[in-house]
């Protein structure tokens, strides 16, 4: 992901932990026999980066409550830790299909339970031919969570050429590139 983001956007990317298998970080680290930094260590590194930049994006793998370290620390713990010292905006990236309403409501509920109000939702991989559930979810996600839908990113966006990506990305946030959906 880091190389793709950097090649498409030209943004500076720092990656502190890379694991070989596409699994929850704690699981992948255990399987590889490596230890990963504790959430508190990640928080300090993010603070160091945030002091020199206007915007910092922190991406996790597997979801808000997936363990990031052997102590049971999660992305939610990291976010709450950072929010104590820096302004934090949380954008929840969600799936398009059946089951996303449940997953998204659970994620938003967990954030709110820690005093973190999500800024918005982003559908992370919108199919070229969305089914009924996917189309309905565009309406239902903000309705059931009370959180606005900020963007719908098409499936395969990471495979675009950088100039194509830069030209298309604004349409993902203004809704002009979305398939029609039922209301």
Can you say where each PLM-predicted feature lies in the sequence?
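Switch II (G3) loop of P-loop NTPases
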Residues: 42, 46-70
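Structural motif
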Residues: 57-59, 91-93, 122
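N-terminal phosphate/diphosphate-binding loop that engages ATP/GTP or pyrophosphate donors
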Residues: 1-40, 45-48
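Histidine-anchored nucleotide/phosphate-binding helix
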Residues: 75-83, 102-113
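C-terminal lobe/tail of nucleotide-utilizing enzymes
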Residues: 108-183
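Short, structured coil segments at secondary-structure junctions
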Residues: 8-9, 82, 86, 144-147
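Inter-motif core of Ras-like GTPase G domains
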Residues: 69-96
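Charged helix-capping and loop-helix junction motifs
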Residues: 69-78, 105-106, 134-139
